[in-house]
């Protein structure tokens, strides 16, 4: 029975650093004298992990960025593997970032070291056969969504549903008034939150259309306030430029530095790009309209090759197995269509109440004390040695 395990972790993104810190805190309850090393950020270091590389050194996005940084990424991988193997870990835990982590995990598994992958890739959406590669790389997968373990079971892979950390963080009942006060918004006016994505390419595709829809909505809802949280400093100038060309009243338009959660909390309705933000809006119990648009050639390739297995894009709809939030994709993503879908929520409060009750059911399903369950699954694996 291992009393003081050596645990290596790799968090390739800021969200992974957050997950890693919570996991370390819970693992210490099982193993008070455990040692932790790895790749992480400030939160993991504060939790007691000795980091050999920082999470920011792995955080590159897009094919061209990856290619430009590939030599450095490969060097980090080589150095980490060499040092970690010499350190003799009892388990290696890769947190999300599958492009980097699965290769490292497989390398360690081949050397008879237990490996765990925390946060399953979206095999339920596309490229399900990746599950076989994942199974060759890890001893156990820790999943955030309940529909994931049954897919792994078809491939004979040990996968556990631990719940979603965001569902643990967000309370069942949320406070709109406090959020509005924090943003300087009137308590009784209609408020729309606009989130066209976090990447430059997403905002280029969706930003103008979203703002045009908000402008049209303001004609139906006098006194409408629109809050636009910039996901990061890189995308704020583009949003500011798009906003300057929109028809939105200047006095009622609010471009924010980050604060996406506060913006959604303050809003009556959310207009959001398909992605993780839809899950956050659901957990905050906000009615939403979901949209997405990619380059026409990309969309044709995806459709022709049948790369996507799903007929729904928004996470709340996928989790519910029904269309709770309107989805407007590609050619259907027009300002008039978005405006009409948004106006529907503003004009039908009884439907909003019914929707919020359904969102509460999904929230309850996802709230499982994820860090606690993940730590239990890892502790169990360690005791099997």
UniProtKB/Swiss-Prot annotation:
The keyword Secreted does not apply. Keywords: Glycosyltransferase, Lipid A biosynthesis, Lipid biosynthesis, Lipid metabolism, Transferase. Condensation of UDP-2,3-diacylglucosamine and 2,3-diacylglucosamine-1-phosphate to form lipid A disaccharide, a precursor of lipid A, a phosphorylated glycolipid that anchors the lipopolysaccharide to the outer membrane of the cell. This is Lipid-A-disaccharide synthase. Pathway: Bacterial outer membrane biogenesis; LPS lipid A biosynthesis. One of its GO terms (cellular component) is membrane. Belongs to the LpxB family. Its EC number is 2.4.1.182. One of its GO terms (molecular function) is lipid-A-disaccharide synthase activity. It catalyses: a lipid X + a UDP-2-N,3-O-bis[(3R)-3-hydroxyacyl]-alpha-D-glucosamine = a lipid A disaccharide + UDP + H(+). GO terms for biological process: lipid A biosynthetic process.
């Amino acid at each position: 029975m291992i009393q003081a395990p050596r645990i290596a972790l790799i968090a390739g993104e800021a969200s992974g650093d957050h997950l890693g810190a919570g996991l370390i805190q819970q693992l210490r309850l099982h193993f008070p004298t455990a040692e932790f090393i790895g790749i992480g950020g400030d939160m993991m270091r504060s939790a007691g992990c000795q980091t050999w590389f920082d999470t920011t050194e792995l955080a590159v996005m897009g094919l061209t960025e990856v290619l430009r940084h590939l030599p450095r990424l490969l060097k980090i991988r080589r150095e980490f593997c060499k040092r970690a193997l010499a350190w003799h870990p009892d388990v290696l835990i890769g947190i999300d970032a599958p492009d980097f982590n699965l290769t490292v995990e497989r390398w360690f598994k081949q050397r008879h070291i237990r490996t765990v992958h925390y946060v399953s890739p979206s095999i339920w959406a596309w490229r399900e056969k990746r599950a076989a590669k994942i199974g060759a790389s890890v001893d156990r997968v820790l999943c955030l969504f309940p529909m994931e373990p049954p897919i792994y079971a078809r491939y004979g892979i040990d996968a556990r549903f631990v719940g979603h950390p965001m569902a643990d963080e967000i309370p069942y009942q949320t406070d709109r008034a406090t959020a509005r006060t924090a943003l300087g918004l009137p308590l009784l006016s209609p408020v729309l939150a606009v989130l066209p994505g976090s990447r430059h390419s997403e905002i280029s595709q969706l930003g103008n259309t979203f703002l045009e829809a908000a402008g049209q909505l303001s004609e139906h809802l006098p006194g409408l306030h629109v809050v636009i949280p910039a996901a990061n400093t890189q995308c704020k100038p583009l949003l500011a430029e798009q906003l300057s060309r929109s028809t939105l009243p200047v006095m009622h338009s609010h471009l924010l530095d980050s604060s996406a959660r506060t913006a959604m909390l303050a809003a009556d309705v959310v207009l959001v790009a398909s992605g993780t933000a839809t899950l956050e809006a659901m957990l905050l119990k906000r009615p939403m309209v979901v949209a997405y648009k990619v380059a026409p050639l990309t969309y044709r390739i995806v459709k022709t090759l049948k790369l996507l297995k799903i007929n729904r894009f928004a996470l709340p709809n996928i989790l519910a197995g029904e269309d709770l939030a309107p989805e407007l994709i590609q050619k259907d993503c027009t300002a008039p269509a978005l405006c009409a879908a948004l106006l529907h929520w503003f004009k039908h409060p009884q439907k909003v109440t019914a929707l919020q009750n359904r969102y509460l059911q999904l929230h309850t399903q996802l709230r499982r004390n994820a860090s606690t369950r993940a730590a239990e699954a890892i502790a169990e694996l360690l005791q099997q040695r």
